[in-house]
Amino acid sequence: MNTRRWREFSRHVLLALLFIPLHACTPADDPPISLTQAYFFTESLKQIEAGGRQLQAPDLDEAGLKAALAMLDQGLRLAFQVERDGLDRLDLRLGKNYQRYFIEGVENYRLGIEAGDETQQQEGLRLLARWAEFWSQEGEAIQAKLQPD
């Protein structure tokens, strides 16, 4: 093979090698949400659920109340870091429902407890019930999309 043909052949091989990794990274192969965002989302659900369960304890004392509220606060901090567009890639309704029902529900409930405002607590519980309705139907499918293959 002469030098000119060798260079041309080498150039084609190099171009092909460049396109193989690009093809491997097509959007179809990308996860719908980053690992960090998946962590923020799932951990916010866990923290808030744990705080909610602790608030339901029949023998809740002042220390237990403070610990439960701290879990709710930590869950909300994580929830505020979740990007809506990532959630929408998992399910078109997820971002809106997460914000409107889950986050606002927890905020209302949390603030109602702190202020001793039963009406605000009830509003929070009403919103959380709407979230629970959505999550009970779609949660399993959404969580399956978050699991790495």
Task: Name what the model sees in each region.
Residues N2-V13:
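Bacterial N-terminal signal peptides that target proteins for export
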Residues R7-F9, R84, Q122:
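Intrinsic disorder/low-complexity segments enriched in polar/small residues
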Residues V13-I20:
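Sec-dependent N-terminal signal peptides
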Residues D29-A68, E107-D149:
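C-terminal amphipathic alpha-helix
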Residues K96-E107:
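Heptad-repeat alpha-helical coiled-coil/4-helix-bundle sensor or tether segments in soluble regions
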